[in-house]
A protein has these predicted regions:
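Short, flexible beta-strand-to-coil junctions
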Residues: 36, 43, 81-85
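Anionic N-terminal interaction surfaces
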Residues: 1-36, 103-104, 110-113, 128-131
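Beta-strand secondary-structure signal
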Residues: 30, 39, 77-79
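Short, exposed beta-strand/loop patches in secreted or surface proteins that constitute
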Residues: 29-33, 53, 82
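Short hydrophobic/aromatic-rich beta-strand segments that constitute the beta-sheet cores
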Residues: 38-42, 62-65
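Acidic, Ser/Thr- and proline-rich intrinsically disordered linker/docking segments
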Residues: 48-51, 58-131
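Short aromatic-glycine motifs in intrinsically disordered, low-complexity regions
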Residues: 40-53
Length: 131
C-alpha cells in the first residue's frame, strides 16, 4: 500500500487524445484516483469504443508534458507511459479540463504533481521528464 503526503487530486473531466489501441480520439471522459490506481473512463462515442482503464501506480513508468494546438487553442497534454499485464508499453495522452483557465492550470498542476510524486516514490529511474 502506498501512502502519499500529497493530497489526492479531485476527480475531474479529461479529454483523451490517443495512445491506446482503441478507435476514436479526443473524447471526453472522467479521471480519478482509486486507492493505488488511476482510473480513466470514456463512454462509447460515434464509432469509438468505450474506454475503461485502471492503471496501478506500480505499472506507471513516467509522465511528461507536451503542448499541442488542437482547434486553435494551446493545449497542455499529459503523456502517461505505463505497461499492461503483457508488459506492452502504452502512452496515454490526456488533458484534465476546467472551463475557467486559472482553475484549469491549478487542476493540471495538482494532477501532474500528484502523478509525478506517485511514480517517483516507487523508485523509477526517471519518473519525471519535462520534454
Amino acid at each position: 500500500m502506498l501512502y502519499f503526503i500529497l493530497m489526492t487530486p479531485k476527480p475531474c473531466h479529461a479529454y483523451y487524445y490517443g495512445g491506446l489501441p482503441v478507435k476514436g480520439t479526443r473524447r471526453k471522459g472522467r479521471l480519478r484516483v482509486e486507492e493505488d490506481t488511476v482510473a480513466f473512463e470514456a463512454p462509447e462515442w460515434k464509432g469509438g469504443e468505450r474506454i475503461h482503464l485502471q492503471i496501478p501506480f506500480s505499472k506507471m513508468e513516467k509522465i511528461f508534458l507536451s503542448r499541442d494546438n488542437y482547434y486553435g487553442t494551446d493545449t497542455v497534454l499529459f503523456n502517461l507511459t505505463f505497461h499492461d499485464q503483457a508488459e506492452q508499453s502504452f502512452t496515454l495522452r490526456f488533458a484534465p479540463i476546467a472551463l475557467i483557465p486559472r482553475r484549469r492550470m491549478a487542476l493540471q498542476k495538482a494532477w501532474f504533481d500528484y502523478l509525478a510524486q506517485a511514480i517517483s516514490s516507487l523508485g523509477s529511474a526517471s519518473p519525471l521528464s519535462t520534454k
